[in-house]
Amino acid sequence: MSGTKPDILWAPHQVDRFVVCDSELSLYHVESTVNSELKAGSLRLSEDSAATLLSINSDTPYMKCVACYLNYDPECLLAVGQANGRVVLTSLGQDHNSKFKDLIGKEFVPKHARQCNTLAWNPLDNNWLAAGLDKHRADFSVLIWDICSKYTPDIVPMEKVKLSAGETETTLLVTKPLYELGQNDACLSLCWLPRDQKLLLAGMHRNLAIFDLRNTSQKMFVNTKAVQGVTVDPYFHDRVASFYEGQVAIWDLRKFEKPVLTLTEQPKPLTKVAWCPTRTGLLATLTRDSNIIRLYDMQHTPTPIGDETEPTIIERSVQPCDNYIASFAWHPTSQNRMIVVTPNRTMSDFTVFERISLAWSPITSLMWACGRHLYECTEEENDNSLEKDIATKMRLRALSRYGLDTEQVWRNHILAGNEDPQLKSLWYTLHFMKQYTEDMDQKSPGNKGSLVYAGIKSIVKSSLGMVESSRHNWSGLDKQSDIQNLNEERILALQLCGWIKKGTDVDVGPFLNSLVQEGERERAAAVALFNLDIRRAIQILNEGASSEKGDLNLNVVAMALSGYTGEKNSLWREMCSTLRLQLNNPYLCVMFAFLTSETGSYDGVLYENKVAVRDRVAFACKFLSDTQLNRYIEKLTNEMKEAGNLEGILLTGLTKDGVDLMESYVDRTGDVQTASYCMLQGSPLDVLKDERVQYWIENYRNLLDAWRFWHKRAEFDIHRSKLDPSSKPLAQVFVSCNFCGKSISYSCSAVPHQGRGFSQYGVSGSPTKSKVTSCPGCRKPLPRCALCLINTGTPVSSCPGGTKSDEKVDLSKDKKLAQFNNWFTWCHNCRHGGHAGHMLSWFRDHAECPVSACTCKCMQLDTTGNLVPAETVQP
């Protein structure tokens, strides 16, 4: 403290009082002014607070440093260090009945007079007071006093003197300290280490020294210029800050050889550094002639593996006032609150507001932290926006094993919730593609199986100029219409559309029955009409009208259909054209559009966007010529690709066009889950290698990991390797011998190594299990488990490399090749480890390595070490 610039201190146990000290001591009381007016004589500190002067003490001249007594004292007991080296106990109260009244006025006098630079009360034994003095060649610079010691004249020389000529009260002058440290050196700063009552950290002239009062002849020290303002982080007692000129040094007492971090300030010298008592790792610094306080936030980082790893810090500056700041003091309990004082004793109450940290979890939970408060954004009861989010949908679908049904592929749309018609169309398309590919491969292997997955666009192009039309009779009507003769390619297209089953039979009856069972009577009637079976269409509509939930309008439509004659200029055609515009169901509309259209002109059916793509394509295959069909399919494909409509996969197949369509779909919805499963279903190798496909797959894998669906991600990887053998990953890790460097598991490979398979170490043909407790190459023993002290090794059961070719390998659940509990596991930092089961059991209750004398926090090195799979947790 300087005699010209004031310092400021909060009372440790009186959170509404603070002391300002320069040439005199002033005690202030802080009051809130939120709901009240400013009292007369009060000083405005901020918009919400004001200070009232309670008392002034001018009895201690030549003050150089002040320290508040750490124990509770309503009269605010203070220790004052003076320019002559004396330490005086004084108070700012007027209660003469205080329990500390016998201490007030007591002086602690060094042997030789010199300036007292710093004072520090012991936080564990509050009666111990350490004083740091300037250098004297024949005296110590660090003196530790006991303010309540009972001295006798035989032990400690004492004398009673008057404080001044006008005073009548006397006090004790104590001249014998408890401890004397730091001979022939100067002490510039002091602080007690909170972890031990008898450890004192001192900033000497050229070094930082840790004194142990149990053995004062020895000290631990490090040479440095940063010896001023030593202070201990209240939340991390091994972290200490000190400064010199414009640099702040951060020390770790566990590795005291050099600073773990050096903070370079402005060219101006520092005057004060202080840790925040309410916030972990927040350090405030002040430079001379500055109105800015710089804050350093020491971020929490994982335990460093390398010796040179520095902690992560966030730096920011705050400006509590416009004038230069002489000193500041953190409030002991209010979060991030401080009082600053200027050289002319103007004070300001200031709060450092925290940055708001947002956290958006993979399961769509939003939380943010501000100071000590943690807030969560919850969804309103009537708000279903979360259910519409694609991430939530993908997570629920993953729980239902969506996409993994490779036998009945169409069922995947049910696993997705059976709500999206595009997904339903997609999975039925993929189901038909798989079904007819297998059927074609059985009939003629390698012929047209791959064409199926290329989509209807490629199928139609392969048959250009090969189809002619012919006249066909209507069923239930004396009329004929032109229909294209169905060659093999058009039949395949109708099969992929789902209208007909596999085989040469083109009967749509089974398809109509399935539509009726699903309640899609309007669609069934339209399909029947497109197949020139007007009688069946009328029958379906009548049945729908007479059902429990039937629509009476279906009877009206059925009656209208029954009056169809095929005449171009009839009143019926005119009325149906008007009725068509009033119908809401798209299939009823296209029925009248078909009946009222001219031969070869079916735009009213083909371009009705509310009708399923597969029905429009099937209609086109029956009624359009090759040229018209190719032109229509090309145009429709481009529309589907641009819109990202999954129904278009029927046209594009799993080709490059399909990837383009899926890219538009992912851009529109973000559904990388469906994109991944779809592309894996039957795409050729060049399509699977497309970087867009790989991007979707890897992003979906990352999503599963982020959701902690590790088992689901493993299932996806297995599913992927089955459908795309080239994606099967190579072995990522193997255990090698420390002596010869060979893999210890080579003996279990499928090909024995020159007759040295592992079976030679046991009895030939013996069913007894052997253990790989030594290297198969050099026979050196493997490391021992840190807990059971048995050599690490995995029981081997029916090892493929050590059995005869005609023997079956037993890989049942009870006799697997390697059980997880017996697997090798070790820490990448300290290299200690053992059986996985033992390690898991140990680290359920411990964070430190089980090996004696090893202090490695093995489990804390991995940030996911304490996570558990979340696949059983319902959202």
Curated annotation (Swiss-Prot):
Localization, UniProt: Lysosome membrane
Which GO MF terms does the UniProt record name?
A: zinc ion binding
Q: Which residues carry this modification: Phosphoserine?
A: 759, 766
Q: Which GO terms describe its biological process?
A: cellular response to amino acid starvation; cellular response to nutrient levels; oligodendrocyte differentiation; oligodendrocyte progenitor proliferation; positive regulation of TORC1 signaling
Which Cys pairs are S-S linked?
none
- Describe its assembly: Component of the GATOR2 subcomplex, composed of MIOS, SEC13, SEH1L, WDR24 and WDR59. The GATOR2 complex interacts with CASTOR1 and CASTOR2; the interaction is negatively regulated by arginine. CASTOR1 and CASTOR2 convey leucine availability via direct interaction with MIOS. The GATOR2 complex interacts with SESN1, SESN2 and SESN3; the interaction is negatively regulated by amino acids.
Q: Which family does it belong to?
A: Belongs to the WD repeat mio family.
* Entry binding sites for Zn(2+) 3: 827, 830, 858
Residue ranges annotated as zinc fingers (C4-type) are: 735-781
UniProt name for this protein: GATOR2 complex protein MIOS
Q: Where does Zn(2+) 2 bind?
A: 788, 835, 838
Note the InterPro entries from the entry: MIOS/Sea4, MIOS_a-sol, WD40/YVTN_repeat-like_dom_sf, WD40_repeat_dom_sf, WD40_rpt, Zn_ribbon_mio
Zinc finger annotations (RING-type) as residue ranges? 782-863
Quote the Gene3D superfamilies the UniProt record gives.
YVTN repeat-like/Quinoprotein amine dehydrogenase
Binding locations of Zn(2+) 1: 737, 740, 775, 778
